[in-house]
Amino acid sequence: MPCEAVRAHRTSTVGTVEVTRTERRVRARIGTWPYRPDVAHLVLLDHQMVPSDADVRSWIDTARRDGAVAIRTGALFPGSVGPFLAAGFGRIDELALLERPLVEYRRRRREQRVRPLRRRHLDAAVRIDVSAFGPVWGNDRAALSDIMHATPFAHARSITVERTIVGFAMTGVAGKVGYLQRLAVDPACQRHGVGAQLVDDALAWMHHRGATTAMVNTAADNDPALALYDTFGFRRRADSLVLLELRLDTMS
């Protein structure tokens, strides 16, 4: 199979929760970062909420009690960033937020067969995810499982070549919004239509489930991913998402 390595398509998980503990004061959860049990992962369950300074201090205290050396946030909208910056968090990544209407969607001609991605396939999906996104941004089995169950309606699909999974997509719908939550393609097989086929399948499913808007995010400087989404009618919103980190092992 002719394949060429291209830059990884890093995508965070809009609309998902990758965590294990629920804080009482606000809707947020704290877990661990994939492959880094010493790094706390904080996710706001309501993307539009603005935490207070006291909320942020409480989360820092929780992470410190759990022995974390750092705490990282999930993707934050601009309005939620202020209290974190005031507490000493710094920016570690910026994500472009893209959307497109789904009132109508005409599926493209299928070039490859898209198959269900089941739990027994997660180990293969993890391999692809880490190879595409690297050890810092790649998901482990638990994180991918969380993504599959993060929305009321979920859709996980893969493409297989010679009995080997070479790409997968995880999609969810909540209300009238569809989220392309994770898209990963083996670096050796990128730019051969695998990602495009998976995006097409995801959008068709969102439309079938009644979503009127589709959303996805990716690294703000990831030109290949931005170009791919542009071909599907996604347009970049004015607001970007950011991920923040606070080192706890250097704080007094």
Which residue ranges define each predicted feature?
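Helix-loop element at the rim of GNAT/NAT acetyltransferase active sites that forms part
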Residues: 127-139
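A short beta-loop-alpha structural element at the N-terminal edge
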Residues: 113-125
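Conserved GNAT acetyl-CoA-binding A-motif
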Residues: 63-76, 206-218
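A conserved beta-strand-loop-helix scaffold within acyl/acetyltransferase catalytic domains
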Residues: 32-33, 138-162, 166-184
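Conserved donor-binding loop and adjoining core beta-sheet/short helix segment
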Residues: 2-64, 169-181, 186
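Conserved acetyl-CoA-binding loop-helix of GNAT-fold acetyltransferases
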Residues: 50-61, 185, 191-204, 208, ...
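Conserved beta-strand-loop-alpha-helix junction that forms the acyl-donor binding cleft
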Residues: 72-80, 216-226, 242-249
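Conserved active-site tyrosine of GNAT-family acetyltransferases
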Residues: 84, 89, 229-230, 234
